[in-house]
Amino acid sequence: MTFSLAVPPLFAALAPARRILIAGAGGGFDVYAGLPLALALRANGAEVHLASLSFSQLELIDQESWADRDVAAITPDTASPDWYFPERTLARWLAAHDMPSTVYAFPPLGVRTLRAAYQTLIERLDIDAVVLVDGGTDILMRGDENALGTPVEDITSIAAVTALDVPIKLVTCLGFGIDAYHGVNHVQVLENIAALDRDGGYLGALSIPGSSREAVLYREAVADAQAATPERPSIVNGQIAAAVGGAFGDVQFTRRTSGSTLFVNPLMAIYFTVDLDTLAARCLYLDRLENTISRRQVISRIEAFRNEIATTRVPRVYPH
């Protein structure tokens, strides 16, 4: 597909889609990073559904909330004793704003089982575009970097979706720099983006205007989630929301980051988007995960790959 500077490639790529699934790739609050995109797409007339690879105790929800095997349809009224429930928190916020309020949730799974769950949901909703959203950029790691961040859920999501027959499959990242806490070298992130560009798989960067409707509502949703989950607010989305609001530097908003120096900055408010299949093709260990059923299997196979790899790329300091 040929893109133009006049139209953001992210929106150009999704223009033919009728029904779009935006799914948090890394679990937990990652789905919130897709909210500005979802709001913009809905304003343009697209039908958008939200999904999340959940860290909540989905086994505790009522049976009526299960749409199918390994696919829960979380609504504002979904009952659960689990206090950490980002999907329900988001569903309630959406309902309060008179928006479609179902957030689909997948339990932690291996590649084969998550792929089956995605296939079920895609068929159920007649989806023709899937966008995996990552809060941070460690989803762009290919395996030979100095550190991979927290790859388990991200790579499981990529491996699950890349094999599905869906016309449009994208990955977008919001929160550049956040994964430094987990050892990610962001020069290597930029190196990977450049390689994806050479392969024709980079759809550019798109900043969220701080005064836009999408930005205002996103900040409101993040604040609502922080209030609903005071013991475990999203560090990732808290920093992104601060960046989207024009904040800079060591912006503290939770005791969870006390003792750490944050670096909130405008790069965190930019979507970096790539073609999902191109990204999957560059992963050095994706084939090892193909037959996994459980999350534990994914973890052990990533660990085995990292133990076997002869050398990793030497991290570099950003020179500017």
Where are these regions (language model features)?
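Internal, conserved structured core segments that host functional sites
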Residues: 101-164
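A glycine-rich helix N-cap at a beta->alpha junction
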Residues: 66-90, 190-220
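Cap/lid and interdomain-hinge subdomains that line or gate substrate/regulatory clefts
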Residues: 81-112, 133-135, 169, 176, ...
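Short, glycine-rich nucleotide/cofactor-binding loops
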Residues: 22-32, 146-149
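Glycine-rich nucleotide/cofactor/substrate-binding loop typically near the N-terminus or early
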Residues: 42-43, 48-105
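Positively charged, low-complexity intrinsically disordered leader regions
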Residues: 1-20, 25
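C-terminal accessory domains and tails appended to enzymatic cores
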Residues: 226-320
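Histidine-anchored nucleotide/phosphate-binding helix
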Residues: 31-50, 154-163
